[in-house]
Amino acid sequence: MAIRALEGDLIENMKRVIFDVKGLVHPPNRIIAYPRFIPDSSGNRKRKKASYWKVYSLTERFKFLQRDLPHYVVHDPIFDTTLCEVPVEDVIKHYKPVEKLQRLRSSKSLSTLENRALQLAELLREKANLPWNALGISGSILARLSAASSDIDPIIYGSQNCLKAHAALENLLKHKRGPLRPYTQDDLKILFEFRSKDTAMNFEDFVRTESRKVMQGKFNGTDYFMRFVKSWNETSEKYGDVRYGNLGYARIRATVADDSEAIFTPCKYKVEKVTVVEGPRPAVSEIVSFRGRFCEQARANETVVAQGKVERVRDSKKNHEHFRILLGNKPSDYMVLA
């Protein structure tokens, strides 16, 4: 079975574990994805007769994998790091956000959360003038495992659609009587308690970046977290075209030269005037992350301090090499305004 898995999709294996897909580049016959919903008779998420636990932190996800699915944990030679790679032959279901939204639109019996997700999608489509196939709903709604406290996880596909949706969100958040609200200080405290479990950062630095993000907030009282993902025809990289080499760990101070890819997952910040505070010293030209929490983290001309893995990036097709900082799975990985 051939599966074209995209950031924000979910896949389910033969043991009924549900994984969230990361990125757009995957090895042959395997999908880079991490466990999100784990079957457990004592779980607090219900779907028909099955119970699940939702796993949040990367530490807990890897603990589960090492215990129950150790053969999924591999050192990938192309990415030069340890990843969870799900064999395609183990996948029994592929959940697609666009198809989920289509089903919500045609359904006659939606939950309160599903109805709210549909309303948010309709609002974005109208205000940003988007086609329906550019929008999807991911997360617990996609898996049919939402709880009363669940948030809404919309996804926008295609660069131009993403830029239009982002601009529409900015405008909507300015209307104090509208359905969208930015996070308050109290909301940010709750978010900080959740995020600080696996990303080290003090509250003041956290508020400086998170308070101005438009991809997260409240819609009619329900949290939303939006992802912006490039479409397949914008992604030419195939597995093996580019090789990544781990050169160690570093902390740098740099100026953001280009933030045009800051909203996307994965996000990218071109940097200049780089000073290495600690660690290896190759000429780093960008900061990259596959984690949504690092989107919209800084703007052009701002100075940042970032800490993460230093990687050599070799593109065999373009015969080009450069160096980057990858903000990944370690709690010590961070990027803050200087």
Regions found by a protein language model. Give the residues of each.
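Catalytic core of pol beta-like nucleotidyltransferases
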Residues: 1-149, 157-338
